[in-house]
Amino acid sequence: MNKQMKKIGFVIVTCIVSISLSAAGAEQAVQGTSAEVNEGPIVYRDLPYVTNGHQRQKLDLFLPRGQEKLPLIIRIHGGAWLGGSKEGEWPNDYLHFGYAVARINYRLSQHAIFPAQIEDCKAAVRYLRANAQKYNLDPNRFGVWGASAGGHLVALLGTTGDINEFDVGENLSVSSRVQAVADYFGPTDFLQMQAHRLPGGMDHNSPDAPESKLIGGYIQDNPEKVAKANPITYITKDDPPFLIIHGDVDPLVPHHQSELLEAALKKAGVPVTFYTVKGGGHGGFRDPNVPKLTREFFEKHLKAKE
């Protein structure tokens, strides 16, 4: 195994651990500050969102009891598109706040190259929307939340609501649009990552870099494939509101990636909140503003107005 592959393996583990710590910290910081769920949640595990599909094309759904027409938050895991699992996404805190929570797996880059990942995410959204009545979900209040590679995919969900190319397979009569996007430090423009990395940060120009593995070729040699995978390519004024959170000393995904996304969203007139975690790396945030801003964001955009 060469040095670059060893480093990528380390990166995947670092991504998963730091993202998990960040999510766990956010949930611990807000848990118990609202009314408790009367009973344990209703849990559906490993629902196949593609009939007879890949083993990764499954999701878990958590529903608080005694609720109807629930707003839904869909959690999408990170892991450099090479690793990670839905089991690393904790649903409990937002169940207490009156949300349904789904967490999805998707095909990784070793299973299929891009656009398989966004196709899977959209298939999961369509499955949940097509079955909204069955699960007491409000089909008009779907939010998505992800970090790192998951941040990239939720940003793509937000900016490609009007792009039919990525909607393939089943439940095509319903939309894959979402109504709110919480993007934690997701890549947004692969070809600008190297120039803005921190000293000693990850090498994004290697043919073995996660971004190259995602598109199935060296990113420098495939600008058209890169553009197709970049969330900023598709931004239009009708995109949903975004919350972007990023540490300013992230060694894996440069902070500049979120600066680019914020600027492009603002230019298009899309509502966006961008919060920089001072001294923050690739997740693992203990800044109390992170869970506060995230909860306020979803409350504003997914909870029914009185």
Please annotate each region the language model reported.
Residues 27-67:
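N-terminal cap/lid segment of alpha/beta-hydrolase-fold proteins
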Residues 34-37, 52, 192-234, 240, ...:
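Mobile cap/lid helix-loop segments that gate and shape the active-site cleft of serine hydrolases
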Residues 69-80:
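Short beta-strand element of the alpha/beta-hydrolase
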Residues 85-104:
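Short amphipathic alpha-helix adjacent to the substrate-entry channel of hydrolases
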Residues 109-111, 277-284:
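Histidine-bearing beta->alpha loop at or near hydrolase active sites
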Residues 112-133:
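Alpha/beta-hydrolase active-site loop
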Residues 126-197:
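Primarily recognizes the serine-hydrolase "nucleophile elbow" in alpha/beta-hydrolase
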Residues 238, 243-246, 250:
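Short beta-strand/loop motif that positions the catalytic acidic residue
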